[in-house]
């Protein structure tokens, strides 16, 4: 390979690295601006800032939008049919902060069919990944479930593997 070709490859490689760094910075900037907007209770701006990240399935953005923008009953944008799928996608890919709100959505049937089994399973998965789970969050579910359903949920939680795509 000639010197000129090698130089072009190096320049192309550096250009790609620079472009990726810029994308990462813009994603970081979008997240930072969204958090600032949420702190100022400007959920419309927060939603706008998170949209690109949500489309890229960034679990942090899905969590913030799913819990604070669409999942907040005090928000003008409250829509559990938008919120819960975002929380589910983030949780299924291993984003632990999304797991307990998702369990709550299943327990209450908000944006998903009501299911004590699914709620308990997600609580167990979250607990397995060191989320702080208090007994009050799952005791009512245990009263709804039969002993075999409890054991099935425990087994499902232990066997659960996160999606990678």
Task: Describe each PLM feature range.
Residues 132-165:
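Terminal, low-structured helical/coil segments at or just beyond the last alpha-helical repeat
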Residues 10-21:
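Bacterial N-terminal signal peptides
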Residues 29-45, 49-52, 56:
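Alpha-helical segment of the N-proximal tetratricopeptide repeat
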Residues 41, 55-59, 71-73, 92-96, ...:
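Short helix-capping/linker turns of helical repeat alpha-solenoids
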Residues 39-48, 75-86, 113-121, 152:
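Structural signature of tandem alpha-helical TPR/SEL1-like repeats
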Residues 2-12:
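Bacterial N-terminal signal peptides that target proteins for export
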Residues 33, 64-72, 101-108, 137-140, ...:
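Hydrophobic face of amphipathic alpha-helices that form TPR/SEL1-like repeat modules
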Residues 51-53, 89-90, 125-126:
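Canonical positions in the second alpha-helix
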